[in-house]
């Protein structure tokens, strides 16, 4: 990631994060990440982004949140909320659809495995180091059209929306920690990585993740 205007800039009212194939500091690709850590951290509310996704296989755009106590507790104990991730359709064995997007809730090892393993329409993971629950849905025209990706964060539950439609609800009654502490926001565009099993389209030169706005309502 760099802070160069080649990779991140505001233009015509949009935040553009651009990934490029180029030789830079010994790396094959460049891109950017922006965050609000130590600048804007908050607890509860509605968090929303309107964006258009980059149109290249191998891109991994994300809009997510991390616990503000990350530096002291570390991950995954600080908690992570993935409001949007896109790109793993290139490795999906069940849904080969460029419109596939997902949201997830990550937290430390939990005693409430049976509760979260049975949330409808979700995928539950227990890696030993962390637990997380992920939900998937599909959208139309992810590269041509803007869509809104939202999280409604309350003391008792997390609700994830795409274009105002609820598709993932995570109860917090038994697992409020670490989601009862302030979090900060991040937006980034990765290239390859485990999300795509390292795959990047051979003809890739550059792609842009275009963000119209990010809003927090409290």
Which sequence ranges carry the predicted segments?
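GH16 jelly-roll
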Residues: 1-218
